[in-house]
Every structure is written in structure tokens, then in C-alpha cells.
């Protein structure tokens, strides 16, 4: 059974507030648009620092659906803490490019590790649910 096809679930979700991190990326923006098309009354916001190519184009598409973006760095807890309370946070944010991981380890750790920890703290404070999506790329570091 598809949750979006179930009327009871759809009525329940209309009252939901959902934040999608990495929401202007490929995966995040498609999830946001899919949910908005299926359940138009659900409040969907995104959090994205717009640092990747294509993010600004996706932002324009999201605006057409009434989806607001917070241009924050997920690794900055003082910004994450200011976000409103959400029922669900869908974490699509990741620094997944292998080349970036080789030349800017701090950036990768700040986004992928510290950022996820910041979301967990925010969820714990607000009793929100977290849906975590992993990177499409897994790589190792030679020690």
C-alpha cells in the first residue's frame, strides 16, 4: 500500500510540517515536489546552502510549489536551532563528491557528520522524527 494513496494517511499528513535538508539538490528537490503534488496542503520547507551546481535551478522549481528554503549551513547549530519545529526532517544533505572529500576533509566532516548530529539534536529538542538518507557514494580513506 502506498501511504500517499491512503486517504487516512493523506488527511493526517495535511497537518504535517516537513523539513528536507539538501532540499535544493536532486534527491531532496524531487522528494519535496513529489510530496507537494501528492498532498498539496502539507507544509514543506527546505534547508540548503545552495553551494552545488543546479541548486539555484531547483530552488526556482520549489518556489513554484510554495516551498520555502532556508539558506543555512547544516554544520552551524546556531542556525539549525532557529528553525521552526517540524514533525519530520528528511535528511538528504551530504557532501558526496569523492573529489571534495579528498581536498576538503573539514567541509565533508562539517556537513556529513556535524550536520547530521545537529539535526539529531534539533529532533531530540522538538520530538521530531528524522528520516536519514545516506550518500550514493561510499569511499574509504587510506590510513
List PLM regions with ranges:
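N-terminal Rossmann-like NAD(P)+-binding domain of SDR-like oxidoreductases, especially those catalyzing
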Residues: 1-143
Amino acid at each position: 500500500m502506498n501511504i500517499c494513496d491512503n486517504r487516512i494517511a493523506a488527511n493526517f499528513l495535511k497537518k504535517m510540517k516537513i523539513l528536507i535538508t539538501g532540499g535544493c539538490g536532486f534527491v531532496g528537490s524531487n522528494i519535496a515536489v513529489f510530496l507537494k503534488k501528492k498532498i498539496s496542503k502539507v507544509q514543506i520547507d527546505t534547508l540548503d546552502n545552495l553551494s552545488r551546481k543546479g541548486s539555484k535551478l531547483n530552488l526556482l522549481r520549489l518556489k513554484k510549489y510554495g516551498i520555502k528554503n532556508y539558506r543555512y549551513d547544516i554544520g552551524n547549530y546556531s542556525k539549525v536551532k532557529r528553525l521552526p519545529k517540524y514533525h519530520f526532517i528528511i535528511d538528504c544533505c551530504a557532501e558526496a563528491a569523492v573529489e571534495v572529500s579528498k581536498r576538503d576533509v573539514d567541509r565533508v566532516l562539517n556537513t556529513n557528520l556535524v550536520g547530521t548530529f545537529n539535526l539529531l539534536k534539533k529532533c531530540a529538542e522538538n520530538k521530531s522524527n528524522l528520516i536519514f538518507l545516506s550518500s550514493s557514494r561510499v569511499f574509504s580513506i587510506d590510513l
